[in-house]
Amino acid sequence: MPQLDTSTWLIMISSMILTLFITFHLKVSKHYFPTNPEPKHTLLLKNSAPWEEKWTKIYSPLSLPLQ
């Protein structure tokens, strides 16, 4: 029965780990990370919707007159 040749495994695994590290480092270095993240102020941000600018009356089904 032939023996499994494992003499090149160390070089192969080492080069694979080095390649993965380099590619991961290049991918991460292309991303933009903010230096000082700050929370958003919800009071200053106001969404203007058309129904907020004019008064509308909502009729509840229970408050309508009986027919």
Swiss-Prot record:
Sites of N6-succinyllysine modification: 54
UniProt entry keywords in alphabetical sequence: Acetylation, ATP synthesis, CF(0), Hydrogen ion transport, Ion transport, Membrane, Mitochondrion, Transmembrane, Transmembrane helix, Transport
Main location: mitochondrion
N6-acetyllysine PTM sites in chain numbering: 54, 57
InterPro entries membership: ATP8_mammal, ATP8_metazoa
Domain of life where this protein originates: Eukaryota
Transmembrane segments: 8-24
GO cellular component, as recorded: mitochondrial membrane; proton-transporting ATP synthase complex
One GO-annotated biological process of the protein: proton motive force-driven ATP synthesis
Family to which the UniProt record says this protein belongs: Belongs to the ATPase protein 8 family.
Known partners and oligomeric status: Component of the ATP synthase complex composed at least of ATP5F1A/subunit alpha, ATP5F1B/subunit beta, ATP5MC1/subunit c (homooctomer), MT-ATP6/subunit a, MT-ATP8/subunit 8, ATP5ME/subunit e, ATP5MF/subunit f, ATP5MG/subunit g, ATP5MK/subunit k, ATP5MJ/subunit j, ATP5F1C/subunit gamma, ATP5F1D/subunit delta, ATP5F1E/subunit epsilon, ATP5PF/subunit F6, ATP5PB/subunit b, ATP5PD/subunit d, ATP5PO/subunit OSCP.
Protein name: ATP synthase F(0) complex subunit 8
Species of the source: Halichoerus grypus (Gray seal)
